[in-house]
Design a protein with these regions (language model features):
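Phosphate-binding site of ATP-dependent enzymes
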Residues: 155-233, 243-251
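Active-site nucleotide/adenylate-binding loops and adjacent lid/helix of ATP-dependent enzymes
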Residues: 90, 101-178, 190-193, 219, ...
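ATP-binding N-terminal substructure of ATP-dependent carboxylate-amine bond-forming enzymes
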Residues: 1-96
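ATP-dependent carboxylate activation and anion-phosphoryl transfer catalytic cores
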Residues: 45, 66, 217-326
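Short, charged, surface-exposed secondary-structure boundary motifs
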Residues: 37-40, 54-57, 101-108, 150-151, ...
Length: 326
């Protein structure tokens, strides 16, 4: 079996479980002993925080101890560190080049990158660069990070000034697009070739993550995602977010170089992304199968819970409930 190390495991029980069902041995790492995904892996380990100099050496030790072939980050938090440390880690890191990861993690630099590569994107400015004739409404958005925290809609210049003073984080200003928003989950090989792209509607989101959606067979979106993924030389999973405006054109707003929050939907639609990832770890070269998925699959997500008990050595383990008396 191929061993896979999941970093910043957090709450991504869905991803850890999907890889195990695909035949992987899951090794989950996190700094927080209460991260639920730790306890759904075959092996789990507590590691230093990302900013600690011991973070990468701790991951390398897990790679050596468990013969890890593939490293999969489950949040944006450590992607730059991992992308810069490929040689030291000693396993395939499922991320694009470090420069692409860094630029996509900064919404203003991502906007410039899209323009450089000929990818349509909404007009975007730094706060001191908004032109006087900019059309309102405008969005004030956090420059870094993920989710929908610190996003404000300004109806006029007075509101724009207020929100730029109110927001606690470094921000950008972006044109507010009409039309419908879509997410496209892509998976690319280690050479940046797009193997599949699965569009989905955004029926409902919470905290920036899709919690309700439906897979759709939209050839324009599939081709858009392939073109974007290959222009940027993406590697592994990525979630591409875009708007389709009234004239039918598309504008990219964000790309997350990881499995998106709506990952259960492309998985249920037959995307087989964990199997593709394991094939790459084994040195195989899967052929592209664009459009190979089921349309009309609806996802609705919900919260679950996990009870833990002390393990006797300062660690925790899942609580085993005896129901013999029920």
């Amino acid at each position: 079996m191929t061993s896979v190390l999941f970093t910043c495991a957090g709450q991504r029980v869905d991803i850890v479980g999907a890889f195990r069902r695909a035949g992987a041995t899951a090794v989950a790492a996190d700094a927080n002993p209460l991260a639920p995904a730790l306890y759904h892996a075959d092996v789990h380990a507590l590691v230093p925080r990302i900013e600690d100099p011991g973070y990468v050496p701790a991951l390398r030790a897990l790679v050596e101890q468990h013969d890890v072939r593939l490293i999969v980050p489950l949040t944006d938090l450590d992607q730059v560190v991992l992308a810069r440390s490929r040689a030291e880690l000693g396993a395939v890191v499922l991320l694009p080049d470090a420069e692409i990861v860094e630029r996509l993690g900064d919404k203003y630099l991502a906007h410039l990158l899209f323009e450089e590569r000929g990818i349509a994107t909404p007009p975007t400015w730094l706060p001191n660069g908004v032109p006087d004739d900019a059309a309102y409404p405008l969005l004030v958005k956090a420059r870094h990070g993920f989710g929908s925290r610190h996003i404000y809609r300004a109806a006029d210049a007075a509101q724009l000034g207020f929100f730029l003073g109110y927001t606690p984080v470094e921000s950008i200003v972006q044109a507010c697009l009409g039309g419908e928003e879509f997410s496209i989950d892509v998976f690319c090989d280690l050479e940046g070739r797009c193997l599949n792209a699965i569009p989905r509607t955004m029926i409902e989101s919470k905290g920036g993550e899709s919690i309700k959606g439906m897979s759709i067979r939209d050839q324009q979106l599939i081709e858009l995602a392939r073109d974007v993924a290959e222009k940027l030389q993406l590697v592994g999973p990525a979630n591409i977010q875009c708007f389709r405006v009234a004239d039918g054109s598309h504008y990219l707003t964000d790309i997350n170089t990881r499995f998106g929050g709506g990952f259960p939907l492309p998985l249920a639609a037959g995307g087989r992304y964990p199997e593709l990832a394991l094939a790459l770890a084994r040195g195989e070269h899967p052929e592209p199968r664009l459009g190979d998925f089921r349309e009309g699959i609806v996802m609705t997500r919900f919260f679950s819970d996990l009870s833990l008990t002390p393990n006797g050595d300062g660690t925790l383990k899942p609580l085993s409930v005896d129901r013999s008396e029920d």
